[in-house]
Amino acid sequence: ASDVYKRQEDYFVFEAPYGEKSKMTLADGTVVWLNAGSILKYSDKFNERNRKVILSGEAYFEVTKKEKAEFTVQTCGYDVVVKGTKFDVSAYPEDSVVTTALIEGVVEIHRGEQRMEMIPGEFVKLDMATGKITRTRNDVKQWKAWSENRIEFEDITLKELVAKLSRQYDVNISLESEQVGAKRFRISLRNRETIGEVMAALQEIIPITVERRGKDIYIRE
């Protein structure tokens, strides 16, 4: 155990496995909801002055305001720097985009030398392939829906939804073609449903056929 103290810094690792969500409170009072398949790391030196966390996956944050100490979320795409606010960050390594939705307060996106300040109601998306960042205004409350056990998206493709459902329910969902995956729609469900009920609801919304064998689900037109 003495080896632990010889190193400069150790990290606490907080994980939500596939099929589960977790909630935690950090030492500064900040509350974090971690979505399925996500990992949050922070230094054992995390305190009132050093407020930095590393996120792989998706988390919804309610950050305690500290006048002189910024709170930083580091992701694979950019850093989100805040004072005190409510926001959602999604940065799964397997996804092609990194997104931030700001519900309340102010955050700043840092990518290399680039700085972008966000205001409530804004949604920022980084395309990891091109490096392009886009900013839009939409109903950002949908981005915290998962932390309240709801599935709610105003405009989502089947491919995007399937990636989220696979993590949330710990299943393998395959799409027959890119064409099926490109279908766009709006969906609003209570997240208490089983994956079977979610698939049944999807078939009501868009013209698809779903086959299921245990954890494997196949979707075609």
Q: How would you label these PLM feature ranges?
A:
Residues 2, 6-221:
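A residue-level detector for the "anchor" residue at the start of short, highly conserved motifs
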